[in-house]
Amino acid sequence: MKTRPSLVPALTLISLSIASHYALAARNKGNVPIVSPECVNEQVCKDKGLFTNPFEEPLVTGEFPDQDNTNITNPLNNYPDNGKCEENEDGVLKCKPAAGSLALLNDGRILYFNALEGTENVEYNALLEIGSAIVNDQTRVLTMKNGNASWIAPSPVDAGANPDGNDSETLIGDISGFLGDPIDIDLGTDDDRTNNDGALFCADLVGLPNGELMAVGGTDYYHEPGVNTELLGQPINFGLSELEGLKNSRIFNPDDNSWRKTGDMNFGRWYPSAISLANGNVLVASGVTKLVKPVYLTRPETSGRNVTVTETYDTSCGEWTENGALAERSLPLYPRLHLLPNGHVFYNGGGQAFNPFGQGYDQALWNIVAAYDPRSQTWADLGFAGLPLHLSEAGVSDLTSLLNITNSEADESLKGLLSGLTEEFIANPFDALAPIIDDPYKLADVQSVLGAGFRGSTFSMMMPLKPDENGNYNKAEFLTAGGVLTGVAATSPGLYLGTNLARIDSVTIEGERMLYDSRSTGGLAQGRWYGTGVLLPTGEVLVVSGADRDEVVLPGTGFPILEAELFDPETETFRKVAKQNRPRTYHNSAALLPDGSVLIGGHAPINTAYAYSVTLPGFSPNDGRDPSFEIYKPPYMFGERPSIRTGAKSVHVGERFRVGLKNSDASATKMNTRIESAVLVRRTNITHLIDGDQRSVELPIVRHRSGRIVLQMPTQQAVVPPGDYMLFVNARDDEGNLVPSESKAITVTGALSALCQ
């Protein structure tokens, strides 16, 4: 058995073996109970809500798989190291997956996949070992029904990994066996294994119009340079780890729980953002091809930065197409993107960066919020994130595109733009600044200025889209809270400690014009890094999980935040609610469930101080991933609720449709008469705090009679892009609080557009 730091005292192995036996019995029954503690004080539950007890997939026993097998199908063997993992006779651990990424399927089940699978087998230093220790991530489908949870493993369990083999772009090239026997050393380990070159970790998830899900990108792990040999019969495999982005796209079919490969992107992408367009196609932006050493000998001009080329996926034929030079943009990893009501894609000045060290030489451009037009395939700069600076109104909407060094058309245009602006400013500086700053006093707001600019490791939540008096949707608002603020230096995109500052950005659409604005809101109770936001049917935003500081800079040294918070959209303030049971810092996740509750999971930290997985006394738990889930029941679940009886299974833009109400008793009848709004909520597809599909759309109630209501669908397809949604109705209780019903599943259809025939 190989030697490695022991994280669990040997005396616990007997009790863990017994626990594993009973867990196996539960697994064979297919059920694990979801236990909700009793509400001791009803008023407290109505004010703060309640978390269920944690629940998780049981351990399984069996034969440990071949390490070179591409599709590792089960967590196996019966030598438990702790309650999360099982160990074989060689000391290799196989652990239950944590929900680093998850998606709500149309039937209410949860698809999720692991993050950083295999880091538990690092012996000394993650930076030197993960290129060989990490393996492709497992996936699971979780079913929650009648108070029980059960799991199945999709096929293939690792989504098919990288069926075409890795496509690594190494600096060293193929230098193998240069010392000859008996020490056969390979300085490039990018092609020595097939069970770690297609990990789902750091892919993005997006929903397709037909109810399937697509994972875009992922990770190929290797060492560059690295040593892969045997010495005295013992394997030696270490080096400087590299994480390379994949070109792969993989589709999950919920009907048979299977994964299949679809078209490859033109660029490998690690941490990309994917978003559904109005016509059902998918836009992908950013990502990096090589995280640690972003140097590309075949394309030197693209070195030292993230991928600037955007691509569009045609759902009709499964192919990716590059969008052209003017569609390029320098963006952070996992840029916060949203589909606007006019079909443009809004970048909200947020993303991931490896703070405080940065990610690209041009990252100062990440401070500029912008919108991408899929029709013209161009970007328009709208403003400076968090400040009332209207770049689009001052004639500089294409400044960022012109500053892109790979834009061959930029030189003359940039000279002309700068020359014109200089002449105008010299002639009349006040007139030149007027279109940019509509209210100079806003720049004196200290909170706005401190919270302005690029925000790292934060959520960006599109607030409910609401129609105007004519039924048109012309304004979108976005809540940003927590994360880390922009650093002072241009090469430092973020600070170390989490912030509590929050703001709402807005985009108002007036014909072809888009006006950006921003305002500060009440802040979080404390600074929160990596908090996940969930939009509730009531328009409130739940914030869960995270830590007080950046757990990527120095993993394992943060303090987890257990107390959840609720944002009230009417007062624009946060308040504390119930405490979750388990600390969940890095790679946590959450999703709104069909009954209005919220599933919370994840926690897959990097090895402590980039060494091995161990919890430092008093700090965040870092002894491996947490495979458990818990469910938060918001305050509105502890009282009377309206109830939907029937509804359309599918609707088209512009249609009216009826919803039957369930007047099962006097309480339901009373609440049904008080219904004042109905909302369509897109099903969650979340990873690393982002969900490009996230949206809630308020539908006009055109008729409300006893036992039924009639709703009007938007006429704008970009407001409700085709795909799977949940329909909720909201009513006021006796205290005047908005209370949602349980939802009905509904599919929005639309005219799909093909790029390739």
Question: Where is each model-derived feature located?
Answer:
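Bacterial N-terminal signal peptides
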Residues: A10-A19
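Kelch-like beta-propeller repeat domains
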Residues: A26-A410, L414-Q757
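Sec/Tat signal peptide C-region and signal peptidase I cleavage site
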Residues: H21-A25
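Bacterial N-terminal signal peptides that target proteins for export
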Residues: K2-A10
